[in-house]
UniProtKB/Swiss-Prot annotation:
SUPFAM superfamilies: Zn-binding ribosomal proteins. It comes from the Bacteria. Belongs to the bacterial ribosomal protein bL33 family. GO terms for biological process: translation. GO terms for molecular function: structural constituent of ribosome. This is Large ribosomal subunit protein bL33A. Keywords: Ribonucleoprotein, Ribosomal protein. The gene is rpmG1. InterPro entries: Ribosomal_bL33, Ribosomal_bL33_CS, Ribosomal_bL33_sf, Ribosomal_zn-bd. GO terms for cellular component: cytoplasm; ribonucleoprotein complex; ribosome.
Length: 49
């Protein structure tokens, strides 16, 4: 079952990206290194509710 998730920057807290994930394959929260516009650099983004 695919669900929509939001990815938030760990440094500034901005919610920059919306993605989808398969809950059956990825039960835990996703962490990806993505570009943050506010910080103007690549930072770690975590899945939020």
């Amino acid at each position: 079952m695919r669900v929509n998730i939001t990815l938030a920057c760990t440094e500034c807290g901005d919610r920059n990206y919306i993605s989808k994930k398969n809950k059956r394959n990825n039960a835990e929260r996703i962490e990806l290194k993505k570009y943050c516009k506010r910080d103007k650099k690549s930072t770690l983004h975590r899945e939020t509710k």
